[in-house]
Amino acid sequence: MKKTLFALLTGLFICLGITQVAHADDYLRIGMEAAYAPFNWTQEDDSNGAVKIDGTNQYANGYDVQIAKKVAEDLGKKPLIVKTSWNGLIPALTSGKIDMIIAGMSPTAERKKEVAFSNSYYTSEPVMLVRRDGNYANATSLDDFKDAKVTSQQGVYLYSLISQLKGAKQETAMGDFAQMRQALESGVIDAYVSERPEALTAESANSKFKMIQFKKGFEVG
């Protein structure tokens, strides 16, 4: 069965496409982390158009969820979010557990062997998130992170960008952005590489955080 991956390519573009539905019922099952605000997150009720997360009493919301609802409607289906870890998304799709993915993912040649990518719906850029009272709060360039302990999410292109930070210490990649925020606040890391929407969300939610955006930033692709 042909699968189409709905991929949110963070930093470059977000992809969308239509898939053959793997399940012969009333639901369109969409895989996502539900942990990458403002695109997708987990909440405790169905307020503001949230969609039920399969197998739980929780709900997912965000830009990706709203798009998923529209796609499901166009296909005559009801949306059902399947909360899935990052590394489990493609296996869930290829095994038929889900019908599509909406998640931050680069369309690499290796991934294209298993899934198909659609056109984008959003363009973003990589930035840094630091502590407002930390040693790197006044950074203005990629060269200002000497000795900084920096990480990003496991399996995403953002982690590979750390090598462009001159003198930075590349820490072990982390599972999700909630984990990185906690590590940053506690001082385990000095910064992490993110995308502008996520960093803005983190900065707005926690006054201890500061987003660093560069005039001459990371080279991507």
Q: How would you name each of these model-derived features?
A:
Residues 1-5:
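Positively charged n-region of N-terminal signal peptides that target proteins for export
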Residues 7-17:
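Bacterial N-terminal signal peptides
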Residues 18-24:
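Sec/Tat signal peptide C-region and signal peptidase I cleavage site
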Residues 25-104, 113:
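Extracytoplasmic small-molecule ligand-binding "clamshell" domains
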Residues 29, 127-129, 221:
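Residues embedded in well-ordered beta-strands
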Residues 34-37, 57-73, 105-106, 127-176, ...:
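Bilobed "Venus flytrap"/periplasmic-binding protein-like clamshell domains
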Residues 63-65, 80-91, 137, 172-186, ...:
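Short helix-initiation/N-cap motifs at beta->coil->alpha
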Residues 73, 78-144, 207-211, 215-216:
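Acidic, polar ligand-binding/catalytic clefts
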